[in-house]
Amino acid sequence: MSWQQRVDDALTARRATDTLRRRYVVSQGAGRWLVANGRQYLNFSSNDYLGLSQHPQIIRAWQQAATRFGVGSGGSGHISGYSVAHRALEEELAQWLGYPRALLFISGFAANQAVITALMKKNDRIVADRLSHASLLEAANLSPAQLRRFIHNDTQHLSRLLQSPCVGQQLVVTEGVYSMDGDSAPLAEIQHIARRHHAWLLVDDAHGIGVTGDEGRGTCCQRGVKPELLVVTFGKGFGVSGAAVLCSESVADYLLQFARHLVYSTSMPPAQAQALSASLAVIRSDEGRERREKLAALVQRFRAGVNASRFTLLNAHSAIQPLIVGDNSRALRLAEALRQQGCWATAIRPPTVPVGTARLRLTLTQAHEACDIDRLLEVLHGAGE
């Protein structure tokens, strides 16, 4: 088979199963409204859960820092790209989340891959929730360690997998809030089981940080859990982008030596780091608390209204509210029907989710108003098949 035939066959297979992904060009994609092709839509696809991407205080912090530092970092943090803004943000994050150290990464994907790639060796074992993010599972598959996946949120299955003999070290991998199902992991029980088997715990709290817990400290704080490795990302609740790994002093020093994604990548712009510090200040403030409370009320309003419809609603109380449709074609038709009525929603299909569980991944944000939720419910009820 030629290279071109391989490419063509893969694309043909995606088209045949209605799983071909596409991008939409938008003029505005975060916040309450999405603008595409000159039309305005209520935006139910954004991860900007607290509406901070449009916050004037955060925008101003970025602008002022860009004037001071320029628009790029100029290199890896190991060469010349570790500025006072980066150091300040790392120290603020570590203090906020109660860890000795925080290390910044350019994305959550890079952070997850870096940690697993650097830590895991031959004869080690990774035991991951089967619905863990692609960045975690891909890194686990590519590492020399054995990967075993436990049934989603099934702590008994997790315990059985950890009990089987392992010559090396074991790492348990889970998420705080799951990106496609919107539900939360039983973190306290998972941590208890991991410690009983002398395993370390890695929690990716991309969708919980900033949004849940006291001062927005995330799902781990909310559940009274402190994993050995906590990954937080800044493209959701923080409204910016990037990520950080929270860990011990020695693990941070280890990652600085052996995490290739960190060593060989240009660091985030200092202006971005300063904007993230401004975002953190908002998240920790009374305003941040009010934003979280408003979001929680909107989620409750949506769930109370959609229960009367004909869609399958998962047990999710986060900003992520997936409606399971099942069939790929039906999910695409439903997303298009909502867009025709002025509501922008995204159809998620395999391989992102398991076969037969195609869905609308609806996300609610603090930028929405109660009338927006009511409009979404009205359109959903009218579009049900």
Swiss-Prot record:
The keyword Translocase does not apply. It catalyses: 6-carboxyhexanoyl-[ACP] + L-alanine + H(+) = (8S)-8-amino-7-oxononanoate + holo-[ACP] + CO2. It is an enzyme of class 2 (transferase). The modification N6-(pyridoxal phosphate)lysine is found at K236. The keyword Transferase applies. Pathway: Cofactor biosynthesis; biotin biosynthesis. Substrate binds at R21, H133, T352. GO terms for molecular function: 8-amino-7-oxononanoate synthase activity; pyridoxal phosphate binding. Its EC number is 2.3.1.47. HAMAP family: BioF_aminotrans_2. Homodimer. This is 8-amino-7-oxononanoate synthase. It comes from Salmonella paratyphi C (strain RKS4594). The lineage of its organism: Bacteria, Pseudomonadati, Pseudomonadota, Gammaproteobacteria, Enterobacterales.
